[in-house]
Every structure is written in structure tokens, then in C-alpha cells.
Amino acid sequence: MNFDLTPEQDQLRDAVRALGRRYGHSYFVEKAKSGGHTTELWEEAGRLGYLGVNVPTEYGGGGGGLTELAIVCEELAAAGCPLLLLVVSPAIAATVIHRHGTDEQRKRFLPGFADGSLKVVFAITEPDAGSNFHRLGTVARRDGDDWLLSGRKCYISGVDEAQYVLVVARTEDAATGKLKPALFLVPTDAAGLTWSKLDMEIVSPENQFLLYLDDVRLPADALVGGSLDAGLPALFAGLNPERITVAAMGVGTGRYAIERATEYTATRKVWGGRSIGAHQGVAHPLAHAAVQVELARLMIHKAATLYDAGRDLEAGVCGNMAKYAAGEAAALAVDTAVQALGGAGMTTEYGVATLLGAVRAGRIAPVSREMILNFVAQHVLGQEKSY
Ligand SMILES: Cc1cc2nc3c(=O)[nH]c(=O)nc-3n(C[C@H](O)[C@H](O)[C@H](O)COP(=O)(O)OP(=O)(O)OC[C@H]3O[C@@H](n4cnc5c(N)ncnc54)[C@H](O)[C@@H]3O)c2cc1C
């Protein structure tokens, strides 16, 4: 058993931490409140190779694994910049294309993931299907060599910033019964693709959208893997990277909140000479949150290590557990930090209440805590499936 990062991973952690701190939470919040995007941070991280750490070197990437990408997600979040697009683009989309794309799709897309110049967002959720992906109603039908895609998607993050959307659909002849997904790379400027912004109670420069696909015409090579049989394994390939990186973001956010709070409570004095952090009523909840965050962090390391060793099934169990634990720990840490700061906790200036919406959403998306508990009950505890 080894709990140490390699020297290269340590260097990556330090370098990403330094970059994140240079931008910081006030940059993130200012972009969110002015309707902007974190373009400068994304582009700089891309130039420095941090967004492509998990892309193979032959395509210009860092040749690392999910461990490296999780480090990038955690450290940017720990600096107050939790970037959701890291989860959808380099974690989900790049992995799907790397593992299940055709040679031509790898050559075409992976270099853009390697330097961050390409953003591909991910669209699976639908209004009438929700957590039940077997009910997906977005349909792809053949028209000569082309495909025509029609359907609706909801809560899709970052469409306005991306060049492509990776759309999960089903073919016309597989319109009922168990999902046989087909994944398509849809350019965001394709005719027939439109979107409208959802008003969300989350302070973030990354937004969610309703997506409308009305007979979007796509060439044959838009189908990931070039074959309908590639759909299901391609969809599954994205799940572990998604769970693990979103968990890393949660842990980073939890660390950020605890750091803000402990800086404050160590120096704030309202009862004579001792800091409020000397009072166990203030310090213990923070210590409890720190324990939860660190436990989630351990599970992320285990999940990423298993994934990078090619042990996908075990990584799936640990990745789900890590995502659950990190979602709970992040929500606890931010809420506890707000309380420890008192009134200052609710101000924009102290930069913790600004994360309340994001960490609350982290218990719902990209997979809800209940669906993870269903997975654990079924696959770890051997219980009958209820749905
Ligand atoms: C900030 C944010 C960003 C998102 N970004 C994306 C994105 O980029 N791309 C994308 O495709 N989607 C995205 N989503 C959607 C997200 O993945 C879904 O919201 C999530 O999967 C839950 O689906 P739902 O909202 O339809 O909830 P529903 O499926 O309607 O569920 C509602 C509630 O019921 C519970 N529930 C449902 N079924 C069961 C069951 N069998 N057992 C126990 N409990 C159950 C759920 O856990 C949940 O609490 C995003 C959502 C948010 C909030």
C-alpha cells in the first residue's frame, strides 16, 4: 500500500495549486456574477498542459491517467475555482473518444483535448427520463449515409462555451425497452441545434441549458466508434472518470471552505484574548468536516489508482463511493464554514456562501446520492434492484 504521490504528481499538484491561487475564488465569483466565463484560467491551464494530463502523449497530451486529472480538478477547486467543464470535457468526452472513438476520431479530437483548445460537453439528461436512462427519448434515424437527431436534453453544462456536444441518443429501431445508446459528436453550430439558459441558484460562470435537437443532420463519422455496438461501452467508459473527477472537485471545494474558515476562526476574537477557534463549539464541527473531506479524498485516490491500473469494475465501486462521500463532505464543509464565519460567512467578500449552491448540486449531479446508494445496495450488498 502506498499513499504517496509520485514526484511528478507532487509537482503537478504544486503547479496547479499555484495557478489556481493566482486566479482565486474572487475571480471565479466575479465571472459568475458578470455573466462571464473563466476563459483566461482555462486557456492558461490548457497551455500549461494541465487540461490534457490524461491524453496520451502521441496526441500531444501528458500521458498520465485519471489520478493526474483528479489532482488538477481538486487543486483548482481548492483554490476556489471548481470547474465543472473539467468533468465533462477532459474527463468524460476525452476518455470516451480515446477508449471508444475510431482512429480518425482520436486523431481529430484528442490533440484539442491535449491543449484545452477543444471543449466538448456532455448531454444525457432528459426531462422525461431523469435518472432512468432507459427512457431516453432522443432518437437518431438514418437518412442515406447521414444521421438525423431529434430530442430534448436538460441541465446541460457549458454548451455556450463548447465546440461540440457529446449527445447520448438511441436509434429509431431501439426506441423501446433497454437502452442501446448511440453517442454522437454534434457541433454546437449545427443547424437544428438550439438551447436556452436555465436559471440556476448556483454561483458559477458555467451555466446549464435546455437543448433542443430538431432533425440535426450529422455525417456518418459523427457516431462515436463508427458502430452502434460501440454505444454502450462508450457510455460506460465515461462514468468512472465522471464520478472520480467530480468527487475530486468536491474534496477541493471542501478543503477551500475549511481553509477559509480556519484562517478566520484562528484570528477572530470576540471574548477577550482567545480566538473563536478556541471554542470547541466552533472548532469541532470544522474538525469533523476536515475528517470527512480527508476520508473522501482517500477513496478518490483508491478509485483513481484502480482505474489507472485498468481495474474498471473495482474502480466503479470505489468511484461511486468516492463521489457519494465527497458530495456529502463538500456540502458539510461549506455549510460548517459559513456557520463558523458568522455574518461574514454570508458575505460575498469571504467567499464561502458563494459555494452553497454548487455543493448542494453536487449531491444531485452528475449522479444523485440516491442512485449511488442504489448501486451500492445492489452491487456491494447484493440487494434486489427496486426499479
Ligand atoms: C448543476 C448541474 C449540472 C448538470 N450538468 C449536466 C450535464 O452537463 N449533462 C447532463 O447530461 N446532465 C447534467 N445534469 C443533470 C443531472 O445529471 C441530473 O439532474 C441528475 O442525474 C438527476 O436527474 P433528475 O434531475 O432528472 O432527477 P430525477 O431523476 O427526477 O430524480 C429526482 C429525485 O428522485 C431521486 N430518485 C430518482 N429515482 C430514484 C430511485 N430509483 N431510487 C431512489 N431515488 C430516486 C433522485 O435521486 C432525486 O433526488 C446537471 C445537473 C445539475 C444540477
Would you name each region that the model predicts?
Residues M1-A79, L83, H100-Q105, G112, ...:
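Alpha-helical interface subdomain recognition
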Residues G49, V72-A77, A169, V186-A190, ...:
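Short Ser/Thr-interspersed hydrophobic loop/turn segments at strand-loop and sheet-helix junctions
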Residues G64, N132-H134, G158-A162, G177-K180, ...:
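Short glycine/proline-enriched turns and hinge-like loops at secondary-structure junctions
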Residues A91-H100:
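Helix-loop "lid/cap" segments that line or gate small-molecule binding pockets
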Residues G116-I124:
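A short, Trp-centered hydrophobic/proline-enriched beta-strand micro-motif
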Residues R135-G137, D189-R217:
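Flexible, small-/acidic-enriched active-site or ligand-binding loops
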Residues S150-W195:
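A short core secondary-structure module
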Residues F209-A237:
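A short, charged helix-loop
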